């Protein structure tokens, strides 16, 4: 049976992981958090002193994921998307969060001032939405609000309906 691949992207702290795990448990699709995968497999290419974090080796990430993506049925969660092959995804969801809500979430994570400011600006200027629309066909890129628990439930329901319809359309 053919299954769709879904990308969840957006600024850190918008709720990609929460949504991805919830979707995976309700849909049976496989959830992959690229940050966790990179940590587990050491898919790094140096260290960024300014942001105090490792630099992702994007080519190695693509190599690591390619077979699973070809098989289908994968939900990928990452705060960037311009290095993933366009053919991988059937739909892309960019999660958006109000900056005051986002600030609190990132502060709780212990982000330093520079990381906080840059991520808030990233959200204000819709950087990841623009990256998504530049990387994928516009008709497969959708924005979802991600501020409150009710919005999470609504997003899960909407995406589950989309998955169900996609499976019907591609397996008959």
Curated annotation (Swiss-Prot):
Question: GO MF annotations for this entry?
Answer: adenylate kinase activity; ATP binding; ATP hydrolysis activity; nucleoside monophosphate kinase activity
SUPFAM superfamilies attached to this UniProt entry: P-loop containing nucleoside triphosphate hydrolases
Q: Mainly resides where?
A: cytoplasm
Q: For the region NMP, what residue ranges are annotated?
A: 33-56
Keyword Cell membrane found: no
UniProt note on tissues of expression: Expressed in heart, brain, placenta, lung, liver, skeletal muscle, kidney, pancreas, chorionic villi and the central nervous system.
Q: How does it assemble?
A: Monomer and homodimer. Interacts with small ribosomal subunit protein uS11. Not a structural component of 43S pre-ribosomes, but transiently interacts with them by binding to uS11. Interacts with COIL (via C-terminus).
What does the similarity note say?
Belongs to the adenylate kinase family. AK6 subfamily.
Supply the name of the protein: Adenylate kinase isoenzyme 6
Q: What is the lineage of its organism?
A: Eukaryota, Metazoa, Chordata, Craniata, Vertebrata
